[in-house]
Amino acid sequence: MLHWYRGQLRSLLNELLPRWQEKIGVSVGNWGIKRMKTRWGTCNQKAGRIWLNLELIKKPFACIEYVTVHELLHLIEKKHNENFVNLMTKYIPKWRSLKQELNRFILSHEEWKF
């Protein structure tokens, strides 16, 4: 099942990333998908790399897009400062409500083993 989810998210990101890179004017050198327990995404600005949480595929499209743009903007602005907030507002005007929506979801589903 994880393989299927990964393929679905990869397919979606293959469409989202080029579109948003062009809009924002950034280029991500490398990106990947992995399971993360505490984050929806990460960005290594120096390496030009972003990682997105596999669990995103289970969330609404708007939330996936929000996290994708959020991480791409970290290629421009490392910190969550005023400039970063202004960029988020420029590209995703309703980002605050999407962030709240995403934070209402469980980050990941832990499998219970007996």
Describe each region flagged by the PLM.
Residues 71:
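Walker B catalytic acidic pair
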Residues 1-66, 75-114:
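Active-site-proximal or metal-binding-adjacent scaffold patches in catalytic folds
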